[in-house]
Swiss-Prot record:
Protein encoded by which gene: rpsM
Protein name (database record): Small ribosomal subunit protein uS13
Entry GO MF terms: rRNA binding; structural constituent of ribosome; tRNA binding
Record's subunit section: Part of the 30S ribosomal subunit. Forms a loose heterodimer with protein S19. Forms two bridges to the 50S subunit in the 70S ribosome.
Species this chain originates from: Psychrobacter arcticus (strain DSM 17307 / VKM B-2377 / 273-4)
PANTHER family xrefs: 30S RIBOSOMAL PROTEIN S13/40S RIBOSOMAL PROTEIN S18, SMALL RIBOSOMAL SUBUNIT PROTEIN US13M
Length: 118
């Protein structure tokens, strides 16, 4: 298994799919990285040599990935909560943030149902 950005990516998959195992790298970003390096997206990771892997590592390091991206996302949410704005309040109460209705659905965000106390 090749190690890129602190993540073991699978050898038996196409390079474009393997790169998506890195947090912050989706299909489009993976295609851009491989295009910049000059590798066909359908190439298996096991067929890549060390120079190609180093070139991919260099390209991936230009993007914000893994721990840095997770930290930035959590800091953005913390900033909203500290501001006390509507979105921050919704985050604090574990409710949907983007305007969805909560009368019937939103069970994923709200958690399991609580029994009525009588």
């Amino acid at each position: 298994m090749a190690r890129i950005a602190g993540v073991n990516i699978p050898d038996n998959k196409h390079a474009v799919i393997s790169l998506t195992y890195i947090f912050g790298v989706g299909r489009t970003t993976a295609q851009k990285i491989l295009e910049a390096v000059g590798i066909a997206p359908s190439t298996k990771v096991s067929q890549l040599d060390d120079t190609q892997l180093d070139a991919i590592r260099a390209q991936v390091s230009e993007y914000m990935t893994e721990g840095d991206l997770r930290r930035e996302v959590s800091m953005n949410i913390k900033r909203l909560v500290d501001l006390g704005c509507y979105r921050g309040i919704r985050h604090r109460r574990n409710l949907p943030v983007r305007g969805q209705n909560t009368k019937n659905n939103a069970r994923t965000r709200k958690g399991p149902t609580r029994p009525l106390k009588r």
